[in-house]
Regions:
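DNA polymerase processivity clamps
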Residues: 1-34, 40-91, 106-226
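Bateman (tandem CBS) regulatory domains
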Residues: 101-105
Length: 226
């Protein structure tokens, strides 16, 4: 849990001379955003910054896209944004090795337009939020080129609908997951289309941008339903 592993309340930033990578995880899901960096440090720098501090920093920045200077110290970090200086403490500890968790290959892949998937997910999860088990089931029928999303509530009933998609390939698959995790991944996405990559029904899956030049994989764990 985050209480027993304080580092999971923070975001791991890895700086080098040409890029910056930010990785948050709560052990049920993770995301990894990497962008190119100008004037990076000559030696690799690894920081764990509290999530609450980053929320406050984002409020200061707002919708603008300013130049930010990051000055790490021994126990704290200084962000300089224009004439504003923002200090945050750093978290002690070792962040999990998340690189090994993200699959490099997949057996099933489906591409969606983000708004289409988001609307279907919203409808399917209306029922699941009424039950104790907040789980939806996605069925990928490659042979018949169908994708279905199903939500159930023992007290109310179930909803099932087909989802429109742009491309579906690989092996047929049925997987269950927490719809809130996928919803938040879609909200964080920065492209109009996303690709979901799967390996096995009982393994985590990834949500990635449908653009080659955007490095932003998000990993979501499955939910066992038996």
């Amino acid at each position: 849990t985050q209480e027993s592993r304080p580092t999971l309340t923070g975001v791991n930033f890895i700086f080098n001379n040409s890029s910056i990578k930010a990785v948050p995880t709560d052990s049920h899901r993770l995301s990894q955003r990497q962008i190119s960096l100008e004037n990076g440090p000559q030696t690799s720098t690894d920081l764990i910054i509290p999530g609450k501090s980053l929320v406050e920093l984002s409020r200061i920045i707002g919708e603008s896209d300013p130049e930010i200077t990051v000055n790490p110290g021994e126990n704290q970090v200084l962000f300089e944004v224009g004439n504003i200086a923002f200090y945050s403490r750093l978290l002690d500890g070792q962040y999990p090795d998340t690189d090994r968790l993200i699959p490099t290959e997949s057996t099933t892949s489906v591409e969606f337009e983000l708004p289409v998937l988001a609307r279907s997910l919203e409808r399917a999860s209306l029922l699941t939020h009424e039950s104790r088990n907040n789980v939806v089931k996605m069925t990928l029928d490659v042979q018949n080129q169908l994708v279905k999303l199903q939500g159930d509530s023992p007290e109310i009933g179930n909803v099932e609908e087909e989802i429109g998609f742009k491309n579906l390939e690989g092996e047929g698959l049925t997987i269950s997951f927490n719809p809130d995790y996928l919803r938040e991944a879609l909200r964080a996405s920065i492209t109009d289309s996303i690709i979901m990559n799967f390996t096995q029904p009982l393994r985590p899956f990834t949500v990635i941008p449908a653009k080659q030049d955007v490095n932003f994989p998000q990993l979501i764990t499955h939910v066992r339903t038996f």
